[in-house]
């Protein structure tokens, strides 16, 4: 497939999407390819949801984002995709009129209290939205056999499994992300399915770098960047 360049406007001096979102999108592709309806939670500038929309033009793709500036960027970036709709809303207050085949989410928080972004307007942490609350709401928005595809810090694996189990979402596929072969995993990529009894499949880890040189990416990572084919444009918003 010839994937067109996805141009993404982002607010200047605000939290920007990073490689986590691109790794998550690549991981999600087998689970969303036949989806009729997809939801991107906490869409930010729209990178995840719009990649889904670009590569699945027959799917209905909804994006929900509570920050007004980021929601504006999602709306701006989504103009070329008639199969998308952006909602400015806190996900916990979001009441969609449909159920989704797949829900994707790169939560902008970490369970253990560390903060992804130093920008106060976009830094969130466990006290604002814990993973258990997120999953409970996801459950209500999924079709009976729908998928929840997400990334999270690897240290919180036990919390993730417990939260999913409490809502009868089964973690079916798991992949860890490591900076180097000899380093511990820092990120997990997970696909959980509603009302599933399947055994867990753990995929080989995604190794991101050959060396400490940030541009010395592995072949798989370079391939992911090529598949996603995104370009960021920083914009000043009042």
Model-derived segments and spans:
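Short amphipathic alpha-helical segments
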Residues: 75-76, 115-117, 161-164
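Residue-level signal for inorganic ion chemistry
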Residues: 24, 106, 134, 192
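S-adenosyl-L-methionine
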Residues: 1-32
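Mobile active-site "lid"/loop adjacent to the S-adenosyl-L-methionine
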Residues: 107-133
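Conserved SAM/SAH cofactor-binding pocket of Class I
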Residues: 26-96, 102-105, 111-113
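Conserved Class I SAM-dependent methyltransferase catalytic core
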Residues: 7-9, 13, 130-185, 189-190
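SAM/dcSAM-binding transferase cores
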Residues: 184-238
């Amino acid at each position: 497939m010839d994937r067109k360049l996805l141009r993404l406007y982002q607010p200047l001096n605000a939290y920007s999407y990073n490689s986590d979102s691109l790794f998550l999108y690549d991981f999600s592709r087998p689970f969303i390819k036949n989806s009729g309806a997809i939801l991107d939670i906490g869409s930010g500038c729209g990178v995840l949801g719009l990649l889904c929309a670009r590569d699945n033009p027959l799917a209905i793709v909804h994006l929900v984002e509570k920050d007004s500036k980021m929601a504006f960027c999602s709306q701006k970036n989504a103009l070329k995709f008639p199969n998308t709709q952006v909602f400015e809303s806190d996900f916990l207050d979001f009441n969609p009129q449909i159920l989704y085949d797949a829900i994707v989410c790169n939560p902008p928080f970490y369970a253990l209290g560390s903060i992804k972004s130093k920008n106060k307007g976009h830094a969130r942490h466990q006290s604002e939205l814990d993973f258990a609350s997120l999953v409970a709401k996801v459950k209500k928005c999924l079709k009976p056999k729908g998928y929840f595809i997400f990334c999270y810090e690897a240290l919180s694996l036990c919390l993730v499994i417990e939260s999913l189990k409490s809502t009868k979402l089964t973690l079916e596929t798991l992949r860890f992300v490591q900076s180097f072969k000899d380093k511990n995993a820092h990120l997990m990529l997970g696909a959980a399915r509603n009302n599933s009894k399947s055994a867990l499949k753990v995929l080989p880890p995604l190794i991101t770098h050959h060396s400490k040189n940030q541009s010395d990416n592995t072949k798989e990572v370079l391939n992911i960047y090529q598949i996603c084919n995104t370009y960021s444009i920083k914009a000043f918003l009042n």
